[in-house]
C-alpha cells in the first residue's frame, strides 16, 4: 500500500500491542488527557469504584492497574466490586444448548425487577457464583418484600379507617412508650449499619440488616401494637403508634430505595406525596436517612433481644410439652444474666400465655442429672477402680455433682481410699426433667414451664380456642375488619355452658353484638375444639 501523503510504500510496524491496552487507557483516553481536560481528569481520577464480572480480573481490572501504575504510579480505582457468574439451579453454567439458560426479560416479567435485584443483593457475596432459580427469588421476595409490603398495607388499612394524616401530628419522642422507643432505636441502628455497610461495599450485610429490621418491625412491633391501632377514637397512644410506624416505614423505605427502587417509590408516593404535595417528588431524589443518635438506646435493644430469646425458648418448651399457645399456663421460671422489669415480664407472659413469670437464680431443681463413666478415658486412667467409679456415680447426688463439675471443672470421688478426679470428658451425663415441668436452654438463658393445668386454666383454654375459631370464620365468611357480627353455637352442652359464662369476653374479642346458644344461622361450620365437637355460626349484623 502506498502512503497517501508521500506516495512511499507503507510497512506494518513490527510491534504488536494487546487490544486490552485500549480498555486500560479508558480513564485518561476518554478525556484526551494529557493534551486537554487536565483538571477534569484529575478531578475524576482515581475512580471511587469499578465493577465487572470475575473474568475481568485478568482483563479490564489488570489492564487498568498496569497502565495506571506505569504512567502515574497509582491505582486507577479505590474499590472493585467483582461479580460472580450467574449459574443455573444446579450450579451449572447457563447455556442455550443445554436448555438451562434463563431469559432475563422473562424473569423480569415473572418476578419483577425488585425481586431479582433483592435476590442478588442478599443471596451471597457479589464475587461468588449465584445459582439463579425461581424458588430462591420468590423466597427472598416473601421474606423481605412481602413482609415490608404487608406492614405497609396494615398501616394503610387502619390509617384509611381513621383518616389519619401524618402531616397533622408530630412525633413526640420523650412521651413515647417503650415499644415505640425500641422500634425507633432499632430503626436508627439499622440505618447506621446500612449506611456503613454500603460505604464499605458490604452489599449482603446491608441487605440482611434491612431484612432483619423489617421482620422485627412486622412480627414483633406491629403484632405487639395491633390493639393500639384497633382502639376507638384518636387518643394519644394511638397517635404515637401511627406516627412511630409511619416514621419507620418512610425511613426504612428511603434506606432500601437503592435496592428495591420500585416498591419503595410506591410506598413513598402513597405515604408521603399523597398527603404533602410539597414533599420531594421522588424517593430517589431524597437524601439517605440521617441517623438520630439520640434515639439509639443500646440497653433497650439488648433487653428486647433477651426478651425475644426468652420468648423463643418458651415457645420451644410449649412445643416439647405439646401444649398449644392458646392454652394458658400457670407459671414460667426464667434464669438469665439479669432480672427484667415488669414491662418486659408482662410482654413475656402475654406472648407465651402464662399467668406468671418468675426469675430464678437457679432452675436446677427442675432438672435431674445422672452420670456414667466414659470407658475410653476412665478405663486407661483408673483401671481396676472402674467398677467402683461406676457404682459411686450411680449413687451420687446429681445436682450437687453437676454444680461441683461446673464450679471446679472436676468431679472428685473417693473410691476405697483412692481419689478419682473426673473431668467432663470422662463422664456420660444424662439429664431428665422433673415430671410436670419442661425446660429449654440456650447459652446463659434457661426457661422452665409448669405444665400442670388446673381446671380454671383448661376452661380459659377452651374460651381462647372458641375465639380463634370465630375469628377464622369471620375471615372465611368475607366479613370486613370492622363488621359487627352475631355468634351462634349448638350441639355441645359443655362448651355452650362455657360460652354462656364468658359471653361478654368472647363478644368483645370478636366484635360481636349478640350471641345465641342452641341454634345456628349465617355461615355455619363444625369444629373439634380440644376433642369437643361443636357447631358454630356467624352472621353479619
Predicted region positions:
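Feature 926 captures the class I aminoacyl-tRNA synthetase adenylation module centered on the KMSKS loop
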Residues: 1-21, 25-27, 33, 71-109, ...
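Cytochrome P450 heme-binding Cys-pocket and its upstream "meander" loop
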Residues: 32-41
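A short glycine/serine-rich beta->alpha loop
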Residues: 44-55
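Substrate-binding cleft of carbohydrate-active enzyme catalytic domains
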Residues: 66-67
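Structured mid-domain segments that build the active-site/substrate or prosthetic-cofactor binding neighborhood
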Residues: 119-122
Amino acid at each position: 500500500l502506498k502512503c497517501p501523503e508521500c506516495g512511499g510504500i507503507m510497512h506494518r510496524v513490527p510491534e504488536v500491542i494487546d487490544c486490552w491496552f485500549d480498555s486500560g487507557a479508558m480513564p485518561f483516553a476518554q478525556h484526551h488527557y494529557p493534551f486537554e481536560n487536565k483538571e477534569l481528569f484529575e478531578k475524576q481520577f482515581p475512580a471511587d469504584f469499578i465493577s465487572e464480572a470475575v473474568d475481568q480480573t485478568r482483563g479490564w481490572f489488570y489492564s487498568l492497574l498496569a497502565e495506571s501504575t506505569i504512567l502515574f504510579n497509582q491505582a486507577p480505582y479505590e474499590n472493585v466490586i467483582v461479580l460472580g457468574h450467574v449459574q443455573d439451579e444446579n450450579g451449572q453454567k447457563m447455556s442455550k444448548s443445554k436448555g438451562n439458560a434463563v431469559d432475563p426479560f422473562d424473569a423480569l416479567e415473572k418476578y419483577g425487577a425488585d425481586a431479582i435485584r433483592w435476590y442478588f443483593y442478599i443471596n451471597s457475596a457479589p464475587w461468588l457464583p449465584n445459582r439463579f432459580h425461581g424458588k430462591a427469588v420468590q423466597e427472598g421476595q416473601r421474606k423481605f418484600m412481602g413482609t415490608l409490603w404487608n406492614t405497609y398495607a396494615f398501616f394503610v388499612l387502619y390509617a384509611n379507617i381513621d383518616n389519619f394524616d401524618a402531616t397533622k401530628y408530630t412525633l413526640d419522642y420523650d412521651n413515647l412508650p417503650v415499644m415505640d422507643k425500641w422500634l425507633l432505636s432499632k430503626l436508627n441502628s439499622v440505618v447506621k449499619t446500612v449506611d456503613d455497610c454500603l460505604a464499605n461495599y458490604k452489599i449482603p450485610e446491608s441487605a440482611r440488616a434491612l431484612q432483619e429490621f423489617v421482620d422485627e418491625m412486622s412480627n414483633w412491633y406491629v403484632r405487639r401494637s395491633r390493639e393500639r391501632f384497633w382502639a376507638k377514637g384518636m387518643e394519644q397512644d394511638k397517635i404515637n403508634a401511627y406516627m412511630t410506624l409511619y416514621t419507620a416505614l418512610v425511613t426504612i423505605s428511603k434506606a432500601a430505595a437503592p435496592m428495591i427502587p420500585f416498591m419503595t417509590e410506591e410506598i413513598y408516593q402513597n405515604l408521603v406525596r399523597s398527603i404533602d404535595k410539597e414533599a420531594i417528588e421522588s424517593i430517589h431524589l431524597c437524601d439517605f436517612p440521617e441517623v438520630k443518635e439520640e434515639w439509639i438506646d443500646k440497653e433497650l435493644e439488648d433487653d428486647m433481644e433477651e426478651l425475644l430469646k426468652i420468648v423463643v425458648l418458651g415457645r420451644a418448651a410449649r412445643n416439647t410439652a405439646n401444649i398449644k399457645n392458646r392454652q394458658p399456663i400457670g407459671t414460667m421460671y426464667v434464669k438469665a444474666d439479669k432480672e427484667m422489669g415488669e414491662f418486659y415480664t408482662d410482654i413475656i407472659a402475654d406472648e407465651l400465655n402464662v399467668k406468671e413469670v418468675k426469675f430464678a437464680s437457679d432452675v436446677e431443681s427442675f432438672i435431674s442429672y445422672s452420670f456414667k463413666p466414659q470407658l475410653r478415658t476412665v478405663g486407661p486412667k483408673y483401671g481396676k477402680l472402674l467398677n467402683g467409679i461406676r457404682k459411686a456415680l450411680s449413687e451420687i447426688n446429681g445436682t450437687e455433682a453437676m454444680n461441683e463439675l461446673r464450679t471446679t471443672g472436676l468431679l472428685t470421688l473417693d473410691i476405697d481410699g483412692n481419689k478419682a478426679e473426673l473431668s467432663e470428658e470422662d463422664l456420660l451425663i444424662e439429664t431428665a426433667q422433673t415430671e410436670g415441668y419442661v425446660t429449654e436452654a440456650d447459652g446463659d438463658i434457661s426457661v422452665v414451664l409448669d405444665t400442670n393445668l388446673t381446671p380454671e386454666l383448661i376452661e380459659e383454654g377452651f374460651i381462647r380456642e372458641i375465639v380463634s375459631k370465630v375469628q377464622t370464620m369471620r375471615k372465611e365468611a368475607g366479613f370486613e375488619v370492622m363488621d359487627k357480627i352475631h355468634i351462634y353455637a349448638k350441639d355441645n352442652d359443655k362448651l355452650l355452658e362455657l360460652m354462656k359464662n364468658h359471653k361478654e369476653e368472647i363478644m368483645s374479642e370478636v366484635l360481636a353484638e349478640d350471641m345465641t346458644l342452641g341454634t345456628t344461622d349465617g355461615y355455619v361450620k363444625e369444629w373439634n375444639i380440644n376433642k369437643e365437637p361443636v357447631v358454630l355460626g356467624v352472621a353479619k349484623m
